[in-house]
A protein has these predicted regions:
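Transmembrane helix-loop-helix hairpins at the membrane interface
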Residues: 89-225, 337, 344, 440
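Membrane-embedded alpha-helical bundles of multi-pass transporters
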Residues: 110-113, 145, 164, 399, ...
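ATP-binding catalytic core of ATPases
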Residues: 212, 441-489, 510-525
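Flexible metal-binding regulatory segments at protein termini and peripheral loops
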Residues: 1-118, 208, 217, 234-237, ...
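Conserved ATP-binding TGD loop and adjacent catalytic N/P-domain core of P-type ATPases
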Residues: 2, 19, 496-498, 533, ...
Length: 734
């Protein structure tokens, strides 16, 4: 059986580390696909449970020098504890390195001519490099044992070479003096490099933690405890993991609902803003559904648990956001390839630079070559490359989730950016999707039995018009409906007591050869001219009733259409409704083009026609009659109240069913993709310029040779700048 899980990863020091762990995981038997996200320090693994287990994956990762948190009930809590532990250790190492580096720097500036000053600098720098900077040397040694290299290898090599060269010169100054070379000491360079890099990593860790704020906010919505009623009637508060489907759960005033369930006792207003984005609490009473993470207001009620733990709607949303944040943008595959070879290539360049200085500048080639080699090793930064895409994705997708816009993956963002046509389904998308029956005309000779049959037929349908009819009739169905059949775009059929009944459009009745009452037909025509939808009811012989249904336009529909038009995006409305009703809705929503009387299969066909005409099409619907069109579109957007088939098909889900979120989703895609490109440009251009300058390319022109300390500072802040640029998305207005 295939299973997809997200595991926290520990010990990642750079993008090369993430590439290494990803390679290890993908090499394990049973692993179908594994992606390691350096920015979020997580691994998304799809694996065959018959061939491998989380424990075996954890062992493989541990053998490669890293950690994978598995087999923990609250993985996120364990990961957060580990993150805090590592952050505190990094913080104290940084403070220690800075405190130790300051006197070394002062000694090198003013007291290096004095022998005691050199020895004090030797002791202090050894403490900074090998005690406070021990993480670099330990990790580099561990990677060497696994025949791998990473960013820590570059830091360990550069600072280690600088410190050992300085120590040799301190102990044996005559070796170089006898050859006419001044024995320089670089204790301050090694110390400052360690201090700068630790400071940079501390800032990076803090910034990366901010990028994950959205997913942590969602996780914080999950209650830790739940009150369950036992079989003997006593109430007991237990960890939420102990709750199971079928349990009776008590929800008191001010508490968060811990499970998805159905109210059967009591009533209260519930704040569902975390799901719908609507700030107004919703009244919940017997028979109503409530969801985990929502907040009960002043009343109290009891619910029968339907879904618990990882099956709740909130858990599904968290999982969807995690999957999206862990997905890879198309450009990321190229970045990963660069990151995987970056460190060995830089080490090769550094050695080549050293040799080139020896060959082409024999007088002071050794000293300058050594400095250039150290600077090349220290200034090159795969971290900026590794952070460029995932940090922007994490912040962008997290911002979407905070605004009720769930994005399936990174590819969906890329597609949304190129959309130039949005096709809107009318019912439930442009309109409220809660139609109300305003008028009803029954044929002579009909009675409660016919009304029960109509109610029974419509109860079996999931169309919003059917719900309106059931609410209008307001009676329990006491007749049995057999042979139920749904004819998409036309209506429903069924049998009761040996007679055949139909409910739906006039076309359905006529296709079945049923006689239509003239008076009803005239009244239906009048309703249609008033932009109302008409529902017919008939038996196998004649029309029995005709109902007029009105569905109000959402308050934000016209504004959303106007925003899309301002982006240069063409809008089109499709509906199975009559021409007059469709024209009225299109006019009020500001939609220029529409097509009425469209069957579900015609919607998908129309999307294909638009694509053939060169448009990049987004289809927006609720999944009731448009799942085929959603699947056909370049970008599928499902309104949150739709059926499960729409959620599975959709690349973007709007939780609140608010159409204004559609232009916001498009704008979010533009901002996120633009940020990714800015980050990648900076990361690449930084390395393209920094490495040659560090190698000494400017020396023949103006005698400039970059100081290794400046190189360390530049490297440290290059990755911080990428994360900071991504964090700008959080404050941008959609």
């Amino acid at each position: 059986m295939q299973k997809k899980e997200v595991f926290p990863v520990t010990g990642l020091g750079c993008a090369a580390c993430a590439a290494r762990v990803s390679k290890v995981l993908n090499a394990q038997p049973g692993v179908i696909e594994a992606n390691v996200n350096y920015a979020s320090a997580t691994a998304m693994v799809c694996y065959d449970t018959d061939k491998c287990t989380p424990e075996s994956l954890g062992k493989a990762v541990a053998d490669s020098g890293y950690g994978l948190i598995t087999a923990v009930e609250n993985e996120e809590d364990a990961a957060e504890k580990e993150r805090l532990k590592q952050y505190r250790a990094l913080k104290w190492q940084t403070v220690g390195a800075v405190v130790g580096t300051v006197p070394v720097f002062v000694l090198s500036m003013f007291f290096m001519d004095l022998r005691w000053g050199q020895w004090v600098a030797f002791v202090l720098s050894a403490t900074v490099v090998f005690v406070f900077g021990s993480r670099f040397h330990i990790n580099a040694w561990r990677q060497l044992g696994n025949r791998a290299v990473n960013m820590d290898t570059l830091v360990a090599c550069s600072t280690g070479v600088a410190w050992m060269f300085s120590t040799f010169n301190l102990l044996f100054p005559g070796f170089w003096l006898s050859r006419g070379i001044e024995p320089h000491l670089y204790f301050e360079a090694a110390s400052v490099i360690i201090a700068f890099i630790l400071l940079g990593r501390l800032m990076e860790a803090k910034a990366k933690h901010k990028t994950n704020k959205a997913i942590r906010t969602l996780m914080d919505l999950r209650p830790k405890m739940v009150t369950i009623v036992s079989q003997d009637g006593t109430e007991k508060e237990v960890p939420v993991q102990w709750a199971h489907a079928g349990d009776t759960v008590v929800v008191r005033p001010g508490e968060r609902v811990a499970v998805d369930g159905t109210v059967f006792s009591g009533a209260s207003y519930v704040d569902e803003s975390m799901l719908s984005g609507e700030p107004v609490p919703v009244m919940k009473q017997s028979g109503d559904k409530v969801f985990a993470g929502t907040i009960n207001q002043k009343g109290a009620f009891r619910i029968k648990a339907d879904k618990t733990g990882q099956d709740t709607v909130l858990a599904q949303i968290i999982r969807m956001v995690q999957d999206a944040q862990g997905s890879k943008a198309p450009v990321q595959n190229m970045v990963d390839k660069v990151a995987s070879v970056f460190v060995p290539v830089i080490m090769g360049i550094a050695v080549t630079v050293f040799l080139a200085w020896l060959v082409f500048a024999p007088e002071d080639g050794f000293t300058h070559g050594l400095l250039a080699m150290i600077t090349v090793l220290i200034i090159a930064c795969p971290c900026a490359l590794g952070l460029a895409t995932p940090t922007a994705l994490i912040v962008g997708i997290g911002k979407g989730a905070s605004n009720g816009i769930l994005i399936k993956d990174a590819t969906s963002l890329e597609v949304a950016r190129n959309i130039d046509m949005v096709i809107l389904d009318k019912t439930g998308t442009v309109t409220e999707g809660r139609p109300e029956v305003t008028d009803c005309l029954w044929a002579s000779g009909t009675g409660d039995g016919d009304r029960m049959v109509l109610s029974g037929l419509e109860r079996l349908s999931e169309h919003p018009l059917a719900e309106a009819v059931v609410r209008f009739l307001g009676m329990e169905c006491q007749v049995e409906i057999s042979g139920f059949e749904n004819i998409p775009g036309r209506g429903v059929l069924g049998m009761s007591e040996g007679r055949r009944y139909l409910a739906g459009s006039l076309e359905l009745l006529r296709s079945e050869g049923i006689e239509v009452d003239t008076a009803m037909l005239k009244e239906a025509g009048r309703w249609q001219n008033e932009a109302r939808t008409v529902v017919w009811f008939a038996d196998q012989d004649r029309s029995l009733a005709v109902l007029a249904v009105t569905d109000r336009i959402k308050p934000t529909s016209a504004e959303a259409v106007e925003k899309l038009r301002g982006m240069g995006i063409r809008t089109y409305m499709l509906t199975g409704d009559n021409e007059a009703a469709a024209a009225a809705v299109a006019r009020m929503a500001g939609i220029d083009e529409f097509r009425a009387g469209v069957l579900p299969q015609d919607k998908a066909r129309f999307v294909k026609e638009c694509q053939d005409a060169g448009y990049k099409v987004a289809m927006v619907g609720d999944g009731i009659n448009d799942s085929a069109a959603l699947a056909q579109a370049d970008l599928s957007i499902a309104m949150g109240r739709g059926s499960d088939i729409a959620m599975d098909t959709a690349m973007v889900t709007i939780l609140s069913s608010d159409l204004s979120r559609v232009p916001e989703a498009v704008r979010l895609s533009h901002m996120t993709v633009r940020t990714i490109r800015q980050n990648l440009f900076w990361a690449f251009i930084y390395n393209v310029i920094a490495v040659p300058v560090a190698a000494g390319i400017l020396y023949p022109v103006n005698g400039f040779l970059l100081n290794p300390m400046i190189g360390g500072a530049a490297m440290a802040f290059s990755s911080v700048s990428v994360v900071a640029n991504s964090l700008r998305l959080r404050s941008r207005k959609l």
